[in-house]
């Protein structure tokens, strides 16, 4: 780990001021970083993948509340920990898909530290990104992509480019994508802007090192959730081991039905894309069906119409089809509600 300066911000404006003043005098590789929980950033610093000359501590900023919005949704502070968010009674009752996604990730200790804003910004877990002696366009632009000719069975098959095939690792972000969350960002000029999560992440294309729409001096302050969705909420995650592992494939789902007919379907996927993935065309295919094998097969074929698979990754298409069939059939056996988590489920 390289030597760095540490400064604690007293307010959002103070944090942005420190950041913009420092960035104006530093090279890209030396830029300062905001740090909240630090559960991903500190690992990257230990491996010298990130080498900030300054850390700006924002963990004590007053961004740790969860409040109702006038529209009937929720406004979540960026400093709310993953554990706090998963344990919140409204999240458990009305946004159970989000609570389930949060509880499927990391360990209780990490969830206690990880912030909501930071979770959205965590970096890929591609093997080659974490190996400084391997080429990686995401870590070092124009150095090449070691994963394409190497081991990539856990990487993306949608939204990739010749430059990068890394997946986005966040479970929470998959649920946020399904819920159409909105990211509130304070800018260096003091203004705020709201960005739908569908527009927050950038595809790798020719610049895989640029992962979001954040600009110099931008700071995530809140995440807004729309009003709750009716239906059966679920989050299913297939991984190499039962705990503390990233998804090979994950599916966030909210499914509403009338007897044996699907009347509303929302789906978002993790482990298959360069960002949390949603395709509304497959939802339209399933709505009005009974979730039969033919409808599921057509939906999955539509989802993977532009997928880039090979002998290492083609299993993901089969895995998604089987998992989606299981999710739909399970939902049809449950009443139309948000499938709230019981108080006995630990965050």
Model-derived regions, located:
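C-terminal structural segment of proteins
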Residues: 1-347
